[in-house]
């Protein structure tokens, strides 16, 4: 029985899931918007939001925790130097999921997951 077990399995074993979400979190931090399936996007929120909350207070310990989850120094630097200060006043809700139809090959529901208040989106809206 799987009572009270949270999180989606996504037909992967635990190490594959952990690696996949680490890679996806790094991609989301690096590009600020990625396209993926809807269930993966919903689950990715549970990985990325705590990382950004961690980045709001800059310390060596927090940087090491972020590195342990992402294994990428470039991503850790962007988290603490750009995203932490950008979301300092926001109490959670750092990501937005936009549904993007269905994939042609297998009709999987697709979605964009993006960071809210990203500069590229603000520039496009101003034009």
Curated annotation (Swiss-Prot):
<keyword id="KW-0687">Ribonucleoprotein</keyword>
<dbReference type="GO" id="GO:0003735">
    <property type="term" value="F:structural constituent of ribosome"/>
</dbReference>
<keyword id="KW-0689">Ribosomal protein</keyword>
<dbReference type="Pfam" id="PF01196">
    <property type="entry name" value="Ribosomal_L17"/>
</dbReference>
<comment type="subunit">
    <text>Part of the 50S ribosomal subunit. Contacts protein L32.</text>
</comment>
<dbReference type="GO" id="GO:0006412">
    <property type="term" value="P:translation"/>
</dbReference>
<protein>
    <recommendedName>
        <fullName>Large ribosomal subunit protein bL17</fullName>
    </recommendedName>
</protein>
<dbReference type="InterPro" id="IPR036373">
    <property type="entry name" value="Ribosomal_bL17_sf"/>
</dbReference>
<comment type="similarity">
    <text>Belongs to the bacterial ribosomal protein bL17 family.</text>
</comment>
<dbReference type="GO" id="GO:0022625">
    <property type="term" value="C:cytosolic large ribosomal subunit"/>
</dbReference>
<dbReference type="InterPro" id="IPR000456">
    <property type="entry name" value="Ribosomal_bL17"/>
</dbReference>
<dbReference type="InterPro" id="IPR047859">
    <property type="entry name" value="Ribosomal_bL17_CS"/>
</dbReference>
């Amino acid at each position: 029985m799987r009572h009270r077990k949270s999180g989606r399995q996504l037909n992967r074993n635990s190490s594959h899931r952990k690696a996949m979400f680490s890679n996806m979190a790094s991609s989301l931090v690096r590009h600020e918007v990625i396209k993926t399936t809807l269930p993966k996007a919903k689950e990715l929120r549970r990985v990325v939001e705590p990382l950004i909350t961690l980045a709001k207070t800059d310390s060596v310990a927090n940087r090491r925790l972020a590195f342990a989850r992402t294994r990428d120094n470039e991503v850790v630097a962007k988290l603490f130097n750009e995203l932490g200060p950008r979301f300092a006043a926001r109490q959670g809700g750092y990501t937005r999921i936009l549904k993007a139809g269905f994939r042609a090959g297998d009709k999987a529901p697709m979605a964009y997951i993006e960071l809210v208040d990203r500069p590229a989106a603000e520039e496009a809206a101003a034009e």
